[in-house]
Amino acid sequence: MYLNALAKVRRGGGGGRPAAGGRPAAGGRPAAGGRPAAGSRAAAGAAGPPKPAKTVRGTVRPRGFGGGRFPPRRFPPAPVDEATREAEKILKSIHAHKVVKLPAQRKKHRGLYKTVRHTMPPDYIPVLGAEVLAGISSPDVMQAVLRIAPTRDNTQAADAMLCATILRAMPYKMVHPFLDMAAEGKDRHANVVLRDTFFPQNARTMDEFKAFMRRRAPDCPSPRTPMVKPPFRIPDAKPGLTPSVRNPRLNIPETAMVSIMTSAPWVAGHSIKGTVLPEGSTGALRGGLASRRWYVDNWVSVRMMGNPPVEYLTFSGKRIPETREMYDAYVRHLQSFGATAVSSSPSPPPNGDAATALANMYVDTGPEYLAALVRALPSGSGAEYEAALAYTVARAVPVFSNGETLHQIRLREGRYRPDGVHGLSDDIAFAEVYSDPDMVAEWKPRLDRIIKARVSEVIAAYRRLATGDLTAKRTPELALSSRIPAPAGLLFPKAFGESAVIRTSRGRRLVIARARRDAPAVLTDLLSVLITPMYPATAEPQRVASDDPTVLGDEPVAAAVEEPRGQAFRRKWGRGVGGKLLDALENYMDAIQQGRLPPYDNDME
């Protein structure tokens, strides 16, 4: 084959005219039978390393050994596999002698013109044909040759194209049939044979190969976004036990928690379908059914009795209100799965002195009314006592930085019945916000977070006072001391517009909204309802007139005898006002007190 002929050339045949009679062969090389030249590669390999030369001064070390005492360090060559080494040998052995001729030139020499023809030195260009590739039997050597050949500087473009086509666009089982076909047609290049003959004859196989390669092609990479490396921060050590030990009830899956809470096995004698919560309370879905998150939260932490009031819905559609026995059974059932190992201190028994001291620090009101508020706290369990105190104090502390709400004004002036203060909801404590549907969507989550944080701080302070623990570390009360800016137009901004006047007294920090003279009668009466006390007396109290618009007037703290709210309103505004306005005001105040405030409607006339 062609590789054998090239091997003879390397052994000294020269490929030209034969050598005879000791005459050097063509190309300046000795005959095949003669001794190879001293500078040839074979002679260099046989003779070994050069010997040091003798000089006058001494022995000269051969090149490559440094001039110092110790020889230089020699690093091992990079590892090359056998297939790559064999491919390099094949590519080095493939050469074809090609002479590049130049056009004739006329040269002036000693006054005569003589035509001479110069020749360039021979240029060795590797020819990688189908004959050479057909002689390669190993797939690894074939792949190495196809990869290395296009990277050589003196490789022809047609050969590089042939290597790329075989390597990337042809199955291996078709390589040797193609090389055999290309080797037969020596008058045409292998690329022409591939394009005109081989591909059309094997179109189906090539289509299957293209589909296979297309399936293996990776998807386009997603656009990369620059990664912002966070600053290095040493993580804080989290003291305490692991969550599974701190609260053993977390060891069961969440689906099991929801299943147990939904069926309510502590309600004996009934098949419970679910839990019903009041409309608008936290965790209530449409229709009052409890949500999945409410079940999980009340499984992890035991809820309080009556906050909010709970009803159990049976499969027959009957609603069973929760009693004290049911609540105690609920607590025992949760504790049977594992009590909290690391928890806060238990609620101390009701302590009136600690509650009075705590309310005196945060509630701005008179001492007699403050004592009445403490006496009106529920005298049940310690948890109910501290919860009622915490919510009352949390709502009594101002939330907005630029004024007080009407609830805080009534509480300071003593206009609530003492036993009704602790049952008020956020709808009454923040009536200015909850009366506007647009304002509720923005401000209700913020108010809920503030009240929840304040309740936690008040409970912690109450337990320190009730237990007399002077060694407990006091945490900063951020929620109780923080204030946020009030929304623009706090009191019914859409209803009043410019019909309300805000008057402020410097000494008392009192903010009162009063209607202008040109305001509609409906808005004037509605604002008067918000300013009036929550418990009207049976007998008409004597009111002291005052020129100061910030003085609300002398109102009784409590009345011995009560009458329905609607009767008091009818007695106050019954003359000269239509019945439609009275009904609207009665419904409005009843909705506020019961926590079912409808969207505010300006057209009450």
Swiss-Prot record:
Name of the molecule in the record? Uncharacterized protein 087L
What superkingdom heads the lineage?
Viruses
Please give the residue ranges the record annotates as the region Disordered: 10-78, 216-248
Biased region (Pro residues) positions are 220-233
Q: Locations of Low complexity compositional bias?
A: 20-48
Output the InterPro entries linked to this UniProt entry. Answer: DUF5877
